[in-house]
Amino acid sequence: MALPSPQVLMGLPALLMGPAQHTSWPCGSAVPTLKSMVTFEDVAVYFSQEEWELLDAAQRHLYHSVMLENLELVTSLGSWHGVEGEGAHPKQNVSVEVLQVRIPNADPSTKKANSCDMCGPFLKDILHLAEHQGTQSEEKPYTCGACGRDFWLNANLHQHQKEHSGGKPFRWYKDRDALMKSSKVHLSENPFTCREGGKVILGSCDLLQLQAVDSGQKPYSNLGQLPEVCTTQKLFECSNCGKAFLKSSTLPNHLRTHSEEIPFTCPTGGNFLEEKSILGNKKFHTGEIPHVCKECGKAFSHSSKLRKHQKFHTEVKYYECIACGKTFNHKLTFVHHQRIHSGERPYECDECGKAFSNRSHLIRHEKVHTGERPFECLKCGRAFSQSSNFLRHQKVHTQVRPYECSQCGKSFSRSSALIQHWRVHTGERPYECSECGRAFNNNSNLAQHQKVHTGERPFECSECGRDFSQSSHLLRHQKVHTGERPFECCDCGKAFSNSSTLIQHQKVHTGQRPYECSECRKSFSRSSSLIQHWRIHTGEKPYECSECGKAFAHSSTLIEHWRVHTKERPYECNECGKFFSQNSILIKHQKVHTGEKPYKCSECGKFFSRKSSLICHWRVHTGERPYECSECGRAFSSNSHLVRHQRVHTQERPYECIQCGKAFSERSTLVRHQKVHTRERTYECSQCGKLFSHLCNLAQHKKIHT
């Protein structure tokens, strides 16, 4: 079967201008206009199904390119028309839809598929059928954004839009190269599968699906409808936060996160934005997980989640990372992953210069500078920059914690949190620091730790200028200035600035201590306290001061120590104006003004302002001295006493007086010494009113009265 050669195809554009350039017209006869002289139908080349299948990829590409060029030339000559105007000739009613495979001598069953359901006449072209049905139903789904006029076909809308754009048919593209690049979407081995082309070339290139025609189906039933977007362009944008969506149906659900509209309420507890969410929530209460994966046995509450999970077993992984061997289904995910190894960070913040490996992380980071928090909790008024953090926070109020640890009984709102917690019991630490070799049980703790080495502290307090390595630390710190304490203990009424501190405090009332040291059998209410305690036995001190070389077991202790060098005291007491280097010392100090002593010894009835003081005191009754000096073997009831004692051996005097330069081994001794310079006398005798600079001097004086 003879096929047109590339030379024949490439010569087609010349046919358009041929009559105007080479034809001689009789004298006195009317010269035909360009409009009547040539139409796209005159220069189009059609193939049968058999002919099309014989073309290779290069020939198909050439055919597609030439047809596009012909269409562009016809359009520029004004020969491309829809049937909106009266009296339009059927041959002029041609748009990109004619780039279809024509079926010569179609059988009657095929022709029947092309008849109008309303009045029955057969129409030769599927394009004509769509327009004819439009006249019957009066449905015009395509609207011009400039003037509001409605059209039956997307192609006619684009033709009309040329009136606004000055007759430039390719106005959606900056140049011809961009058009041809976009048209490659349609150049696959099977060119009849794409139902969306309006975003790629001039009109809807609704190419025929030949198999459906042969089987008697109606492949054109949706031709007059606006197709779903099949590109990566996100058309529907939220006016509140700028987030964009592919589907219009997704936007209303997202908008509910900004408004107070919560249309679905669970009778057991909790409010939901979508109906499917409340159905899923009911399965939390009933414990129903009916969908089980046959491959690995993992169970799911929704069939959709099971199907999504099964793709990990069945899908072919096309993209493999040569660095670590990990495979991916999608190219974009693969590209993002490769940046972990290459260190590439192409997205840079204009405000602070920090770079990110993908755009979503940059958008999230930019909210740190703008202070934008569009997601507000209706229960406590707390606002969040991300919807994921907002949804996670809501579980604090609903108390939905379906994931329980079989080891200690602790429950969690997320399965990932349970997996992370389980590593406390197993001792697993899969995330290792490449700088110092220290290992962590989760990736976020590793990322947090690495900032110790880099010194990166990108989050700055606008109130006092203090900077932090994490946004969560900045938010916690900002509550020092605002005095905000939204989390209240239902047992004693005490309020806290964050939920984690409240949860930690509640264990005082319950006495719960699920974390036990395998070395000395001491138990703790928090896993972090157990990890901290474990370093007493191992002697591990991974945090070193770059100024003096001193090492510490905890990063928080290093930060506190660093203020000895910087003289920084960011925490101010609202009662007396005194400044402190640590928030914990400020809280401890504030109890001097309030007289609050919530911790009572069950043995002797003595009250204490701090839990740690009660624990230290309790050892007076038990005689326990768990902290032993490695130099001389002397034992102490508290770690602080051991640290203080060790300075006798090391001769360390970290607390220096800025007035006279004298150094001291203990901070309390420095504070006492500074009163010599300030002449401050804060201790008053209740008997005679005499003032003293030191408490010990007051105690000595009181003996005169007794």
From Swiss-Prot:
Zn-finger segments (C2H2-type): 114-136, 142-164, 236-258, 291-313, 319-341, 347-369, 375-397, 403-425, 431-453, 459-481, 487-509, 515-537, 543-565, 571-593, 599-621, 627-649, 655-677, 683-705
The root-end lineage is: Eukaryota, Metazoa, Chordata, Craniata, Vertebrata
The record's annotation in InterPro entries points to: KRAB, KRAB_dom_sf, Snail/Krueppel_Znf, Znf_C2H2_sf, Znf_C2H2_type
Domain KRAB positions: 38-121
Keywords (alphabetical) are: DNA-binding, Metal-binding, Nucleus, Repeat, Transcription, Transcription regulation, Zinc, Zinc-finger
Entry's Gene Ontology molecular function annotations = DNA-binding transcription factor activity, RNA polymerase II-specific; RNA polymerase II cis-regulatory region sequence-specific DNA binding; zinc ion binding
Q: What is this protein called?
A: Zinc finger protein 132
Q: What species does this protein belong to? A: Homo sapiens
The entry's localization annotation reads: Nucleus
Q: Name one GO biological process term.
A: regulation of transcription by RNA polymerase II
Which family does the record assign? Belongs to the krueppel C2H2-type zinc-finger protein family.
Q: Which GO terms describe its cellular component?
A: nucleus
Q: What does this protein do?
A: May be involved in transcriptional regulation.
Coiled-coil annotated spans? none
PROSITE patterns referenced in this protein's UniProt entry, alphabetically: KRAB, ZINC_FINGER_C2H2_1, ZINC_FINGER_C2H2_2
